[in-house]
């Protein structure tokens, strides 16, 4: 350890000597010793200035500026006092009065006109010409003056050119000197910086060496102390005590050995820590030296960059002196650069176009997805609409069932009565029943097994009835009125249908056959003006719930025929009752009156007879009423056997009456009387019912008549 302390002391001495050398170099550069500390008072005096502080010095400076005339003039004080000022004012007043006196005298004195008049001298043209023409002496004088001026100007020009050349040379020399001075200054700064950095590094080394020396000395002292302690036994308890027995025994010998082992272990650990600490202290200056090296590298790079900048400046000067020799090359390079820029711009434009196309494709895809979603939503919503339609259909079916029960009672009651009041009220009841029937035509039909059975029966009836039936005969004028009334009634019924029907339904409103219209032409020319209207119900397209079967045509045929025959019975029975009360001469008038009172029944019978003969026309008109035929056939299903007997008898009687009606109108009365006998027995039981129901429907009939009249007026308009 003593050797280590000596080596450290030697290193410390060497470092001190090198530091002294650095201080001397700094003194040479700066002219002062870096170890000398400046006095604090001198700094304060230099900073504060002659005033000794901020405020005083600034005031003195301000006063100095104002006195020198650079700033605003200071206020001048009058030293003479107030008396001198007053005396001066009096003097100025006296002087102003003296000056104003002679002016007042001039104003008072009268002005006199001068007797001397200046003669006007007019120069002639010759005099002017002579003045312009110069003598030879004047010309020579002018030439000399002009020559002198030109000579002076040329001299000035020459001197100016020489001066410019000299100035250029001076400027070049000054620039070179400035560059050299800057380089020298930079070198001096770099040297100074390096010297100060060396000085700092040496100082750090000295400090480290001093610390090492101190630590080494402490370690030596501690080792000496440990060498003394190791001979004693150390207690296990703290604080540790060292003792030695007077007489040694094996137990004490063991304790000494154990304590020595422990102490040696402590000493070794302490030495290791000391060595590590010294290594750390040596590593610190190494790190500092690495930082210094990095700084030196950065400085060298800066110097190289500065030198390159100086070379570039020299090259630029050489290019300026030699001229623009490389302009062509530069122009070509500029053109190539422009072409490159244009190509870059084109590529950028193409990229932008591609991006726009991609955006458009993405938008199209998004729109398609939205459309698909909307269609799925609509498909989901369609089943809900179908369920609503089915619910409406079920409600309509319940209503139709109730109406069928009412109609069966009404159909049984609609037969002739002996009283004239019943004759007038029965057609009104039929008109009230008719809109309900038309409403049923628009409602959806029921597809059941019973409906199919009824269709088969109706087809068999058609085959039996189509063979013996003759051509229909047109009835007189009163038939046209109920047809028009039915048209007027059917239009509001069709318009008030609910939106449950999915398809467009074209409804022909009781179109008469061409034969009937031809025969009515000479009887009612006024009625031709009213056109037969067909009403269409257009609704939102929904999946069809109801389907119209071709078999419905046959159903409507049978229904219309059965209705016409039942009403022929009533009309004939009524005509016979009226003819029995009146004389044979007035039978034609009474029959016409009865037919006019029962307008609805006669019109319906004519329409039914015309539909039976004209097959295609009746099928077209009855295609719209397919759904109601099934309900009618059910309501009439109870009295099929009775209806067959009546229909056969009615057909035979029609054959007999058709020939008579063509020959003369009065023959209808006789035919109706003959047919009455067979029907009276069957119709007597039903007359009582019709009377009671007709009395109930009296109020309704009056309202229906008003509605009919209003509809007629609207159509005529």
From Swiss-Prot:
It holds the Pfam family Pinin_SDK_N. Its main location: nucleus. Keywords: Acetylation, Activator, Cell junction, Coiled coil, DNA-binding, Isopeptide bond, Methylation, mRNA processing, mRNA splicing, Nucleus, Phosphoprotein, Spliceosome, Transcription, Transcription regulation, Tumor suppressor, Ubl conjugation. Residues 2-167 are annotated as: Necessary for mediating alternative 5' splicing. The modification Phosphoserine is found at residues 48, 58, 66, 96, 100, 114-115, 347, 375, 381, 443, 450, 552, 658, 692, 695. The keyword Acetylation applies. The modification Omega-N-methylarginine is found at residue 54. Residues 555-575, 634-652 have a biased composition (Basic residues). One of its GO terms (molecular function) is DNA binding. Found in a mRNA splicing-dependent exon junction complex (EJC). Found in a complex with SR proteins. Found in a mRNP complex with RNPS1. Component of the PSAP complex consisting of RNPS1, SAP18 and PNN. Interacts with PNISR, CTBP1, CTBP2, KRT8, KRT18, KRT19, PS1D/PNO40, PPIG, RNPS1, SFRS4 and SRRM2. Identified in the spliceosome C complex. This is Pinin.
């Amino acid at each position: 350890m003593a050797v280590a302390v000596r080596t450290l002391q030697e290193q410390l001495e060497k470092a001190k000597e090198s530091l002294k050398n650095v201080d001397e170099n700094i003194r040479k550069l700066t002219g002062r010793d870096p170890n000398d500390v400046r006095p604090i008072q001198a700094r304060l005096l230099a900073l504060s200035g002659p005033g000794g502080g901020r405020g005083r010095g600034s005031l003195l400076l301000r006063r100095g500026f104002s006195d020198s005339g650079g700033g605003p003039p200071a206020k001048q004080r009058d030293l003479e006092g107030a008396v001198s000022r007053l005396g001066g004012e009096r003097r100025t007043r006296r002087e102003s009065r003296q000056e104003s006196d002679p002016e007042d005298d001039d104003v008072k004195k009268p002005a006199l006109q001068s007797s001397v008049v200046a003669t006007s001298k007019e120069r002639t043209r010759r005099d002017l010409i002579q003045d312009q023409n110069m003598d030879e002496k004047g010309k020579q004088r002018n030439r000399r003056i002009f020559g002198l001026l030109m000579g002076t100007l040329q001299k000035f020009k020459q001197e100016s050119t020489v001066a410019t050349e000299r100035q250029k040379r001076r400027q070049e020399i000054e620039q070179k000197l400035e560059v050299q001075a800057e380089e020298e200054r930079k070198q001096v700064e770099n040297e100074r910086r390096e010297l100060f950095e060396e000085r700092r590094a040496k100082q750090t080394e000295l400090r480290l060496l001093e610390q090492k020396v101190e630590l080494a000395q402490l370690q030596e002292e501690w080792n000496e102390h440990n060498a003394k302690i190791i001979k004693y036994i150390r207690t296990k308890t703290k604080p540790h005590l060292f003792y030695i027995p007077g007489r040694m025994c094996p137990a004490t010998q063991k304790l000494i050995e154990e304590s020595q082992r422990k102490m040696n272990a402590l000493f070794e650990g302490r030495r290791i820590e000391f060595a590590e600490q010294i290594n750390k202290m040596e590593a610190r200056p190494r790190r500092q030296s690495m930082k210094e090296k990095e700084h030196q590298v950065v400085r060298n790079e800066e110097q190289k960059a500065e030198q390159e900048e100086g070379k570039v400046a020299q090259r630029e000067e050489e290019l300026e002196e030699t001229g623009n020799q490389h302009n062509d090359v530069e122009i070509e390079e500029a053109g190539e650069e422009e072409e490159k820029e244009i190509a870059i711009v084109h590529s950028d434009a193409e990229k932008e176009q591609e991006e726009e196309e991609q955006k458009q494709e993405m938008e199209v895809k998004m729109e398609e997805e939205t459309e698909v979603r909307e269609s799925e939503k609509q498909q989901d919503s369609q089943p809900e609409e179908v369920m609503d339609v089915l619910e409406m259909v079920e409600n309509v079916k319940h209503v139709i069932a109730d109406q069928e029960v009412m109609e069966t009672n009404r159909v049984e009651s609609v037969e002739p009565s002996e009283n004239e009041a019943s004759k007038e009220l029965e057609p009104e009841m039929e008109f009230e029943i008719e809109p309900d029937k038309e409403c049923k035509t628009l409602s959806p039909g029921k597809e059941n097994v019973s409906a199919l059975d009824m269709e088969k029966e109706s087809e068999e009836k058609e085959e039996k009835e189509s063979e013996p039936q003759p051509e229909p005969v047109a009835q007189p004028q009163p038939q046209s009125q109920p047809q028009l009334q039915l048209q007027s009634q059917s239009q509001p019924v069709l318009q008030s249908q609910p939106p449950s029907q999915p398809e467009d339904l074209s409804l022909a409103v009781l179109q008469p056959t061409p034969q009937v219209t031809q025969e009515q032409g000479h009887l009612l020319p006024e009625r031709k003006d009213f056109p037969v209207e067909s009403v269409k119900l257009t609704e939102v397209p929904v999946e069809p719930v109801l389907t119209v079967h071709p078999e419905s045509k046959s159903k409507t045929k049978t229904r219309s025929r059965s209705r016409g025959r039942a009403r022929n019975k009533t009309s004939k029975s009524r005509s016979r009752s009226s003819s029995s009360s009146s004389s044979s001469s007035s039978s034609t008038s009474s029959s016409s009156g009865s037919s006019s009172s029962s307008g609805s029944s006669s019109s319906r019978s004519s329409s039914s007879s015309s539909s039976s003969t004209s097959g295609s026309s009746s099928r077209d008109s009855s295609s719209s009423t397919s759904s109601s035929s099934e309900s009618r056939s059910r309501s009439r299903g109870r009295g099929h056997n009775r209806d067959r007997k009546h229909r056969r008898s009615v057909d035979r009687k029609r054959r007999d009456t058709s020939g008579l009606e063509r020959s003369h109108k009065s023959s209808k009365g006789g035919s109706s009387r003959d047919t009455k006998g067979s029907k009276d027995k069957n119709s007597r039981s039903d007359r009582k019912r019709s009377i009671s129901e007709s009395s109930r429907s009296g109020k309704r009939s009056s309202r229906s008549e008003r509605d009919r009249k209003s509809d007629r007026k609207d159509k005529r308009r």
